[in-house]
Amino acid sequence: MGVEREANAMETNPDEQPSGGLVRRVVAFDVGDRRIGVAVSDPLGFTAQPLFTLHRTGGKGGHRAEMKSVARVLRKHSVAEAVVGNPLYMSGDQSPQAAKAQAFAEELRAEFGLVVHLWDERLTTTEAHRHLDAGGHAVGHERRQIIDQVAAVLVLQSFLDARANQAARSAAAAGPE
């Protein structure tokens, strides 16, 4: 591999940002009225792992506590960008919950200066239930504690896979040097 090829490989390497710094993790949020599932990527941006479920308490005090929890996640995991699940109807139209997800995304942009991606999350909760059923996870309270995390993982993994596929297509289109 020549010097030119190595330099080109760095441009499409998911471990590099255009600024030349190391890519930091991507965090995903599955935003609901009562809970927010949180997942984070590995440092290279290949895989998604569940972090926790943030329980929403409402009111100004509850909202401040939510944002403090988000800030801790961003600092602890050196997050560079975020993905927020965008719950669209199967037709592609906006659901009522989509406006709430978009407002949350805007707040992340404004408060933390993050690059935030709204990502189609259709059927992720259904798929999350299937994963939990296949793993023999209990129903009721235990399931509610983790279902949003699993949905956030599915949203994030979909985003990471799409990003990797785009990088591969771009590299293939550039052709050999």
Predicted regions and their residues:
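Phosphate- and other anionic-substrate recognition elements at nucleic-acid/protein interfaces
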Residues: G2-A28, R34-E177
